[in-house]
């Protein structure tokens, strides 16, 4: 093995393939853009975003780690969300959960 050497897998790698998924329509009713990162608890996003927050509880965007989705003022778009894995505990963000989902 050479330091930094990569051993890529054959075929396609599917992100979040075994996780529960939902699609929501989200509208930015605010006057400023809102950007949401890949692992942010979607139910706790900026209040200017209008969508079914209860359906989004325990979910995050189904996008690659380290990326984000930007909602421009007045924009409406569909997003796909996936459930959190692991211990399914949420801390921080807007402090609405602070524990088990």
From Swiss-Prot:
Example of a GO MF term: urease activity
Annotated catalysed reactions: urea + 2 H2O + H(+) = hydrogencarbonate + 2 NH4(+)
InterPro entries: Urease_beta-like, Urease_betasu_sf, Urease_subunit
A single BP term in Gene Ontology: urea catabolic process
CDD domains named among the record's database cross-references: Urease_beta
UniProt record similarity statement: Belongs to the urease beta subunit family.
HAMAP family to which the protein is assigned, alphabetical: Urease_beta
Protein's name according to its UniProt entry: Urease subunit beta
Higher taxonomy: Bacteria, Pseudomonadati, Pseudomonadota, Alphaproteobacteria, Rhodobacterales
């Amino acid at each position: 093995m050479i330091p930094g050497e990569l051993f890529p897998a054959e075929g396609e790698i599917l992100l979040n393939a075994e996780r529960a998924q939902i699609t929501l329509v989200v509208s930015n009713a605010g006057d400023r853009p809102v950007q949401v990162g890949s692992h942010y608890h979607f139910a706790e996003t900026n209040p200017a975003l209008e969508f079914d927050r209860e359906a989004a509880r325990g979910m995050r965007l189904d996008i690659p780690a380290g990326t984000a989705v930007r909602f421009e003022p007045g924009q409406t778009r569909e997003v796909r969300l996936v459930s959190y894995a692991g211990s399914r505990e949420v801390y921080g963000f807007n402090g609405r959960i602070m524990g088990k989902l």
